Regions:
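C-terminal outer-membrane/trafficking sorting elements
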Residues: 459-470, 474-549
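Loop/turn-rich, solvent-exposed surfaces of beta-rich toroidal or solenoidal domains
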Residues: 340-387
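Acidic/hydrophobic-patterned starts of short beta strands in beta-sheet-rich repeat architectures
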Residues: 51-61, 117-127, 192-201, 248-256, ...
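Beta-strand-rich domains and repeat architectures in extracellular enzymes and scaffolds
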Residues: 33-66, 71
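Beta-propeller blade termini
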Residues: 41-49, 106-115, 182-190, 233-235, ...
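Blade-level signature of beta-propeller repeat domains, shared across WD40, Kelch, NHL, RCC1
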Residues: 407-454
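Short glycine/acidic-enriched loop and turn motifs that connect beta-strands
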Residues: 62-68, 128-134, 203-207, 261, ...
């Protein structure tokens, strides 16, 4: 059996479905959660831009219910210093510190790139417009460039306020009160001029297809740069599609997805050429289309899943270029009761979570199950025809069930796959772009490498085991067992589902080798799911337990 499947936990639920669930290695609470109560709008992870050896996560907040706090756009850099247990905010910016009247709508975009090619990486943040009398043509693209060196900071620091402001901003539109809402963004060099462009799919009629470039991102934010709208559907004599919800790029062509048409925009060497084809039968794809060379033959394919606004199918589709069209192969129908059960596919990312050389494609969901919040993993098995579904594997990477997402709450489209530690396998990060009852869900990190996070020397075998708390469920006490093969410095902590520490049972204590049992008394805690995390030297493992009072 493949390496990944040896590491997966196999659980059973009431439907009889076997769930190959990848262990949750970390639960990261939302920064300033009382302010960021509208969900997480987007995140990117796995970078070490400042070169300090600590892996970084960049995230932006979201607005779901238009409350006074969630309409304020905020961006954060999180980092976990080596040897520490929790991620910390080391840099942040509030868009209203630069433009006081700006407020945001739902589902912003976020990317890391070097648009001007100066060697300094940039955070490219697409704040979704909310036009009003005070802000009729707001900045929709915000670029914060890294300060350089080992600095944590991005942007230009205002000498008066001390706040961090963008190096560059752009409205996209040249007129007021245009409703432009990019939801999917790729960075690529479509026209082959050696400089990256922004390729944006927008879900509103003000502009649906956006291809843009910038000549410079000024270090001092003096606004000397020039943004150019290279192409939009406004240039066409007529437009045969609808609002766009997704985009994928294959070499010099970009494919924009909606329920009316799949629109193709290609660079032919001298100009952009538009064509269109029939949509997927299940309607739109929701920011989940992923382009990759699946079988290493030099050809780029697309994997995408259906969300809504078509028929009731919810397929994972393999899409292959053929002239001006895409050849379509349905790989898995997730609409059945055991999977989505009428729910929707949304969000996606790719990487190699089992280090087997084959790409793992991760897809999120909305209204899935029961159980709720299914995260799907789709992988080509490395041999055979890629159009034969028998050569693919579908597993469930995680499902939040009732512990994170009661009923059908949450919108689990915010996903990234990145190497968050020093082992060779990538990890999955995911969360919801909408809250539950005004509380944002935390970021979850899934690690197929046997619960291990932050291992500095992957050649060193794990020297401890963390057992299942017993009894489980419990009220109000339970025992957490662990075994050390050799002595080490131990920390044992308990967290709630928001990622907040509710108890530290052992704190950096030198502990002898052998079997250990630690009593946990939850008499002062509310019923619910809790996670216990054992850190021995620089290696962590985690487990889950349920308190029923």
């Amino acid at each position: 059996m493949k390496n990944l499947l040896r590491l997966l936990l196999v659980l059973s639920i009431g439907t009889g479905l076997a769930l190959a669930v990848i262990p949750r290695a970390s639960i990261i609470p939302v920064p300033e959660d009382s302010l960021n109560n509208g969900g997480i709008g987007n995140l990117v992870a796995g970078y070490d831009i400042d070169g300090d050896g600590n892996i970084e996560i960049y995230m932006v907040n979201d607005n779901w219910a238009d409350s006074p706090t969630e309409i304020v756009p905020r961006i954060y850099k999180l980092e976990r210093p080596y040897g520490e247990e929790e991620f910390q905010v080391v840099w942040s910016a509030n868009a209203q510190d630069f433009t006081p009247d700006i407020i945001q709508n739902t589902w912003p975009t976020l990317a890391v790139a070097d648009l001007d090619g100066d060697g300094k990486m940039e955070l490219i943040w697409g704040i979704v417009n909310w036009t009003n009398a005070s802000s009729p043509n707001p900045y929709r693209i915000w670029v914060y460039e890294h300060e350089g060196g080992d600095s944590d900071n991005f942007g230009v620091q205002n000498p008066v306020t001390g706040k961090w402001e963008p190096n560059s901003v752009w409205t996209i539109a040249d007129a007021d009160n245009q409703n432009i809402r990019p939801i999917s963004m790729k960075v690529a060099d479509l026209n082959g001029d050696g400089k990256d462009q922004l390729i944006l799919a927008s879900r509103a009629s003000g502009m649906r297809i956006i291809i843009a470039s910038v000549d410079d991102i000024p270090d001092d934010g003096d606004f000397s740069e020039t943004w150019t709208l290279d192409f939009s559907e406004k240039e066409l004599p007529s437009y045969d599609a609808d609002n766009k919800w997704d985009v994928a790029v294959i070499e010099n062509s970009a494919y924009f997805f909606c329920e009316a048409k799949i629109s193709k925009v290609s660079w032919n060497g001298s100009e952009y050429v538009y064509s269109s084809m029939d949509p997927l039968p299940g309607g739109i794809t929701f920011d989940c289309a992923q382009a990759a060379d699946i079988n290493g033959d030099g050809n780029i394919e697309i994997l995408a899943g259906e969300y809504l606004y078509g028929d009731a199918t919810r397929n994972i589709w393999l899409l292959q270029e053929s002239g001006d069209t895409l050849i379509r192969t349905p790989l898995f129908d997730l609409s059945v009761e055991e999977y989505l059960n009428g729910g929707r596919i949304c969000g996606g990312a790719q990487g190699d979570i089992d280090n087997d050389g084959n790409i793992d494609f991760i897809f999120g969901s909305r209204f899935s199950g029961p159980p709720n919040a299914m995260m799907f993993r789709v992988e080509y098995q490395g041999s055979g025809d890629i159009t034969d579904p028998a050569n693919w594997e579908l597993t469930i990477a995680d499902t939040s069930s009732e512990e994170f997402a009661p009923g059908t709450s949450g919108f689990w489209n915010v996903i990234d796959v990145a190497n968050m530690d020093d082992d060779p396998e990538d990890e999955i990060l995911y969360t919801s772009s909408i809250p539950n009852a005004g509380v944002s869900f935390p970021i979850v990190i899934l690690d197929s490498n046997d619960y291990t996070v932050g291992v500095r020397n992957v050649l060193t075998p794990l020297s401890f085991e963390l057992g299942q708390a017993y009894p489980n469920p419990f009220n109000p006490t339970t025992v957490i067992p662990f075994t050390l093969e050799k002595a080490g410095t131990v920390t044992l902590s308990v967290f709630n589902i928001k990622g907040q520490n509710v108890a530290t049972l052992i704190s950096r204590e030198y502990t002898e080798a052998g079997k250990h049992n630690v009593m946990f008394d939850a008499g002062n805690l509310a019923s619910g799911v809790y996670f216990y995390q054992l850190k021995v030297d620089n290696t962590m493992r985690a487990g889950k337990m349920t308190l029923n009072k």
